[in-house]
Amino acid sequence: MKNLFNFFKTSSELRLAYRLLKQINQKRSFYGAMTDFDLANQTNIFKKRLANGEKLKDIRVDAFAVAREATKRILGKTPYDVQILGGLILDMGSVAEMKTGEGKTIASIPPVYLNALLGQGVIVSTVNEYLAERDAEDNGKVYNFLGLTVGINKTEMDANTKRMMYNADITYSVHSELGFDYLRDNMVFSAAEKVQRGLNFCLIDEVDSILIDEAKTPLIISGGKTNLPAQYLSANQFVNTLIAEDFYIDEETKGIKLNDKGIDKANAFFGLRNLYEIQNSEIVHRIQNALRANKVMKRDVEYIVQDGKIALVDQFTGRIMAGRSYSEGLQQALQAKEGLEIEPETKTLATITYQNFFRLFKKLSGMTGTAKTEEQEFIDVYNMRVNVIPTNKPMIRKDEKDEIFATSHEKNQAIISEVERVHKMGQPILIGTSQVVDSETLSEMLNQKGLYHTVLNAKQNQLEAEIIAKAGRKNAITIATNMAGRGTDIILEPGVTELGGLYILGTDKAEARRIDNQLRGRSGRQGDVGISRFFISLQDQLFRRFTNFDQIFGAYGQTNGAIKGKYIHAVLLAAQKKIEGFNFDMRKTVLSYDDVIRQQRDLIYAQRDILLQIENFDHYIQKMIIRAVDIILSYDFIILPNQEIHYKNLINFLNDNLSRITHFNFGQIGIENYPIEQLNEFLIKQLETIYFKQIQSVLKENLGKTYFESERYIILSTLDSQWQNHIDTIDKLRSSANLVQYSQKNPYQIFTEEATKKFNILVAESAYQAIVSLFNNSNAEKIEYIKAILSDGTAISYPADSPQEIIDQIIASNEERIAAARKAKEEKQPEFIEKQLAKLKIEKVESGEEFELWKIGDSKLVNLKKEMPLDEKQNILVKMQQEQLEMMSEEEKNLIQEQNLEIVEIEEIEEEIQNENPQKVEFVDFKNDPDAYNKLIFGADYADKQLISSEEEDNNEKTNINNNEDLERTKGEAQQTAKNPNE
C-alpha cells in the first residue's frame, strides 16, 4: 500500500515513465537475442518508420530497448531501471534529478539516441570541455555502433571544423561555446559561413548550474576598443581617498553608492558643480565601477590575478571563467585597483543570456543531482518540470546537524580538529569551501599541523577531475571550492567503506540549499556509506547579509564552542530561503529586461536570415528608399518649422550624400517644383530610377551575376553596425534605468519605452544608412579595361588605371603559371605516351644497345632506334598499327572509335616510312605531320594544353581527346573573357 501511495504522489510524467519502463523491459530478450549486425540495423529500420510518418513516441520503447542492449554490449554496463526512468523523463523535455553516482551519463544515452534518429541534430551541453570529451568518447562508442556520428565542439576550433562537429548526429559541447557560436552565426555575411544547423534538441548536463546559477551572466561578444586609461586611474585614485562614512553599501544586493559627503568630495576632486548633471554621466559611471571594484569585490573571491591578468571566478563552481571578462568598464576598474596594465574598454557587438539562448531549442531537457528546490523557476522560465528519480540502492549516508560557531576563528579551529580526528582513522575527507581565500587559509592551517592534503580551487582548475577522483582514497584530505570536479565520480578505495566512507565537511552555507546538497552528494553514491557535516560561523556572509546580524551576534557572539538550540538553525534556514528568493527575483528581473531585447534580437536575426538567403534585393531596396526619404524629409534644416521646404538645403544634402559615384545633380530635376505633399513620392521615384537604371546596371557590368553579393554585404554590414550601436546603448540604458527616478513609473517601464523608441530609430536609420552606402558603392564606378596577350595566346584584362607595378605582377604571375604548365607537360609526357600506347596494344618487348623491339597488336614487330625521341616513336608505332585496322572485327573497330581514335586507311605504309626515314628506322618511315597522330591521341589542342596525370586520365578517358571544334570553341571563350573580364 505504501508503494502504491508513493506511485500516485509522483508526477504524471514519472507515472508514464514507469509504464513505458515496463514495456521496455519486456523487449529485453527480443533485442538481446539479435546479432550485432541486426541490432545495429535497427537504426535504419527506425529511420524508415519515421520517414513513413511515425512519430518519436511511436518508436520510443523500441529505441530505448535497443540503446540499452547496445550499451550493455559496447560499454559492458547494463543501464538500471532507474537510469531508463531518468532517460524517459529527459525525452519528455523535463529535468531528471538523479543523485550523484546514479549514472546520469548512461541515463542520457537512450534519449539522445532516440532524438538523433530524426536527423536534425542533438546537442549535449556540459559544464566544461573535459566532461564533453569524456562523455563523447565513452557514449560515442555506443552511438557509433548504432550507426550514428558524434562530434565534439571546442573553443579553439575554426569555423569549418565546428561546422563538421555540428553536422554530426550528436554534438557534445561546453554550454558557453554553444551560445557564442549562435551569436557568431548571426554576424556572418553568407549562409554557408554558419556553423550551427538549427536548434532542435538539447540535453543539458548539470542543468541547474547552467540555467540557474549562470542565468544572470550574459554571453557577450565585444569589439570596437576605446582606450582611456587615465580616466580609470583617476576614478580609482578618487575612490582610494574615501572613508566608510562617504558611501553606503547594501549588504543584501552588494549595491554601493556615494552619500552626500561622498558627492561633495567627488565635486571637489573632479572640479564639478554637480556630479549628477547629465554631462557628467561618464564620470559617474567610472566612479561607480571604481567603488564596486575597491569596496565590494574581493580578490581571490570574485576574481584572481593570474599572469598579470584579471581572471573571473565562478561564484557557484569556484572555476576560472576562461575567456570571460567584466563589461562596461568594470574589468578596467579592477585592473586599475590591482595596478595592472589597463586594457582598452570594448563595445558590445552581440549578447544573449543563457535563459534566452536555451529557450530557442525546440526541445530542452536536463539532468542534475539537485534541482527540486528550484522547480518553480524551471517551470516559470523554461516550462520544464523537475522529476526526482529514485536511487538504485537505498541512500545510507549520514547527514549530521550543522555545527555553528560565533566567530570564523573558532570555526576554523574546530574544522582542523575534526580533520585531525578523522584522518587518524584513515577515513578520507573532502573539505568544501565557497571561496579561494578560504581554501588557502585552511590549507595553511593544515600545513602547520603537518597534514598532507591536496587543494583544488580556481588556480588549479586543469587538475580538477584528477584531484577529485583521488578523494576517495584512504587518508586523503582534499580541499575543493564548491562544485569543483562536478561530474567526476569519487570511487572509494577498498577498505574505506569499513572506515565509514567519504567524509564531506562543508565550511559555510551556500546561497542555495541546492548547492549544499550537491556537496553532500559527493558521498554516499550507489548505496555507499558516508557522512556529511557543515561547520558555520555567525561571521559568514550568509549571516551578515541576510539576517539581523547585530541582534544575532549580540545574543550568541560570546558563546564558546558550538552554539546549541533550534532557533539558530531556524535562522540559518530562513536566511538561505531568503537569499534563494532574492536571487530568483534577480534572475527574473534579468530575464524580463532581456525579453525586451530578445524580441528585438529575434526580429534582427530573422531579417538577417532572409538577407542571407535571397539573391534579388530589388524589393528590399525599394522599401529602404521609402524609409530613407522619410528620414531625409524629417530633418528640420530641410522641412522648416512652418512646414516650408528649404529646397537649396535639400538639393545640397542629396548631392553631398547620394551623388559621389554617379555625380548626379539633383538640382537639375526640378525638385523645387514639387510641394511638400508631392515631394515624398517624387523623390522615391527619382532615387529608384537612379539606383536601378544607373548604379545597379554598372554593378552588373562590373561584377556580373554576383552583383547582388555587393548589395547583400552593404545591407548586412549597415544593419549590423546599427544593431551593435543599439545594443551598446541598451546596455547603458538598462544599467542606468534604476538610478533615474520618474514619477509614477518603474524602471522596467522606463527601460521598455526607451528601448522600443530606440529600436524604431534603429530600423529607420539602418535603412537610410544602407541607401547612402548603396548609392556610394565603389563597385558601381565605371571602369575601362585593357587587355594583354600572354605567351600562350590567352588574354588577360585589367582596369586601365591600374598602377604599372600591379600590371607587371599580373603578367609575370601568369607567365610563371604558363611556364610551370609547360614543364609539367614535358615531365609527364613520356609516362603518358607509354600508357596511351599500351591501350592500343603497342608495347616494348625488348631493348638492346641501339634498337628497341616493339610489338604491335598480336602479330606485328618493329625495330626502332633507341635514340629516337619518344613522340616520334609514338607517331610511327601508331601509324603502323593502322595497317592492321582492315583485319579488325567491327567490335574491335567500335572499341577504338569509343576511345576517340580516328580510323584511317593507309596504303603501303612500310614502303613510305622506309623511304623517308632510312637513318632512324630499319625498314619503316612516315611522311605526315609529326603532330598529326599526337592530336589523334591527345586531342586537337594537344600542343596548347598541359597533359593531365595518368591517374586523372584513367578517370576521364573520354575527355582527354578533343577535336578541332573544341579548340575553336576554347579560343572563342578566351576572346569573350577578354571582353568581359569579370564574368
Curated annotation (Swiss-Prot):
Annotated binding of ATP, by residue: Q83, G101, E102, G103, K104, T105, D489
Annotated spans, Disordered: 948-983
Reactions catalysed, as given in the entry: ATP + H2O + cellular proteinSide 1 = ADP + phosphate + cellular proteinSide 2
Compositionally skewed regions (Polar residues) per UniProt: 973-983
Membrane-spanning parts: none
Main location: membrane
Protein's UniProt keywords contain Translocase: yes
Membrane topology: Peripheral membrane protein
Subcellular location: Cell membrane; Cytoplasm
Pfam families: P-loop_SecA, SecA_DEAD, SecA_PP_bind, SecA_SW
InterPro entries reported in the protein's UniProt record: Helicase_ATP-bd, Helicase_C-like, P-loop_NTPase, SecA, SecA_CS, SecA_DEAD, SecA_motor_DEAD, SecA_preprotein_X-link_dom
Keywords associated with the record: ATP-binding, Cell membrane, Cytoplasm, Membrane, Nucleotide-binding, Protein transport, Translocase, Translocation, Transport
Disulphide bond pairs: none
EC numbers on record: 7.4.2.8
Subunit structure: Monomer and homodimer. Part of the essential Sec protein translocation apparatus which comprises SecA, SecYEG and auxiliary proteins SecDF. Other proteins may also be involved.
HAMAP family tied to this protein: SecA
Role, per record: Part of the Sec protein translocase complex. Interacts with the SecYEG preprotein conducting channel. Has a central role in coupling the hydrolysis of ATP to the transfer of proteins into and across the cell membrane, serving as an ATP-driven molecular motor driving the stepwise translocation of polypeptide chains across the membrane.
Protein name: Protein translocase subunit SecA
